[in-house]
Every structure is written in structure tokens, then in C-alpha cells.
């Protein structure tokens, strides 16, 4: 099985302050997220981490934490906080992918990057875009994308219960997009659905973001 996650931020104490993560200490967070990954991703599965595996940790300490994850095949699409995982001492931690990584799995094109894109390869032909970086929480961002016909999804752990998302779960999610629109208007929270409930949800989300 293939899995995706992003922005675990192992070792980053301040991430507890600017996200809604439910732990009191960074050690509790590290342990819980490792347990969440191991609870879903099997040893022989494949896991894509779309950036920011760790922050404020030495490469050696981050590598030691990586070894606690049972999955053997982990790909890292680099984010803005990642180490140089190609240096010899830690080169075995991940398969390091390019900043924009394009997969084709069972006919489905998937564009991976750390940063969200407004335009991605094949977006007019049903390709998915998976990303991280923005630390969206509670699923609101992903739901707004789906309601507006965008095949774009934040796989970051803050948006997904601090756990990876499987390819099958994403396939089911995107099946809920009735008519992919093939374009993005900036900013992403512009409501084009005509649905008043979506408008109320967007207004509430904007207020929340303004307060944070």
C-alpha cells in the first residue's frame, strides 16, 4: 500500500504553539506521530513524506527518529526545513525525490510537492496534486478544495489526524469531486459553488485564520 504525509516537524517545539497539536511536550508529539505512522503503514508499504520531516534537530538525532519508523521504503520530497539527507552519515534514511515529483500509479497521475501549487501538470486532465507546508487543520481546506472541484489535497499531518493518508483513501476522497474544474482562482478560499453553507464555512475559517 502507498501512503502520504507531510510536516511532521519532529523536534520542533514551537509547532505545538502555532498548530492545534494536542500534546504538551515535543517528546510526547514525537512518540505519538511515530506510533501513528507505525499503526497504519506496514513494513513493506511505501510512504511519501512531502517535506519538513524534522526541525531544530541534528541530522543524527533526526536519523535516529527515522529508524523508529518501521516502514523500509520512505521517500522524502524536500521541504523548507529539511536536512541534507544526501550526506553520507544519513544517506540511508530516505529516497530523496526532486522538489516536484510526478507519479503515475494505475493510470492516475499524482503531482507531489511540499508547497501548494495553483497550477500543476495535467490538472486539466484529472491529475491530483498532493502537498503540505500550510499546516491546515480540521480538514476545512481540503473540503473547500473538493467542493470547488479542485483535485488538490493537503496531506500534512495537521489536516489528517496526525497520521498518513493512503492512496485508497485519496482515491475515495477525489471520487467525491463531481466536476473537476481544472483551474484555481487565487486566493484558494474564493467560493465558486453558490452554496451558502460553503460561504458560511469560508467566512468562519477566515475569521479563525485572522485570529491565529
Walk through the language-model features, giving the residues of each.
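Core catalytic region of metal-dependent phosphoesterases/phosphodiesterases
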Residues: 3-5, 10-104
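Intrinsically disordered, low-complexity, mixed-charge
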Residues: 211-212
Amino acid at each position: 500500500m502507498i501512503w502520504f504525509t507531510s510536516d511532521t516537524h519532529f523536534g520542533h517545539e514551537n509547532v505545538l504553539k502555532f498548530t492545534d497539536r494536542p500534546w504538551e511536550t515535543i517528546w510526547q508529539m514525537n512518540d505519538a506521530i511515530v506510533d501513528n505512522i507505525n499503526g497504519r503503514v506496514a513494513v513493506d508499504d511505501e510512504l511519501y513524506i512531502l517535506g519538513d520531516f524534522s526541525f531544530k534537530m541534528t541530522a543524527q538525532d533526526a536519523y535516529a527518529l527515522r529508524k523508529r519508523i518501521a516502514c523500509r521504503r520512505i521517500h522524502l520530497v524536500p521541504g523548507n526545513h529539511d536536512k541534507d539527507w544526501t550526506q553520507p552519515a544519513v544517506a540511508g534514511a530516505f529516497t530523496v525525490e526532486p522538489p516536484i515529483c510526478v507519479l503515475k500509479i494505475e493510470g492516475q497521475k499524482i503531482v507531489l510537492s511540499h508547497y501548494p501549487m495553483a497550477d500543476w501538470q495535467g490538472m486539466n486532465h484529472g491529475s491530483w496534486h498532493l502537498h503540505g507546508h500550510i499546516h491546515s487543520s480540521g480538514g476545512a481546506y481540503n473540503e473547500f478544495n473538493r467542493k470547488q472541484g479542485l483535485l488538490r489535497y493537503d496531506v500534512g499531518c495537521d489536516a489528517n489526524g496526525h497520521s498518513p493518508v493512503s492512496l485508497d483513501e485519496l482515491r475515495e476522497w477525489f471520487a467525491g469531486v463531481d466536476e473537476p474544474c481544472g483551474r484555481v482562482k487565487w486566493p484558494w478560499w474564493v467560493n465558486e459553488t453558490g452554496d451558502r453553507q460553503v460561504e458560511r464555512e469560508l467566512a468562519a475559517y477566515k475569521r479563525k485564520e485572522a485570529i491565529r
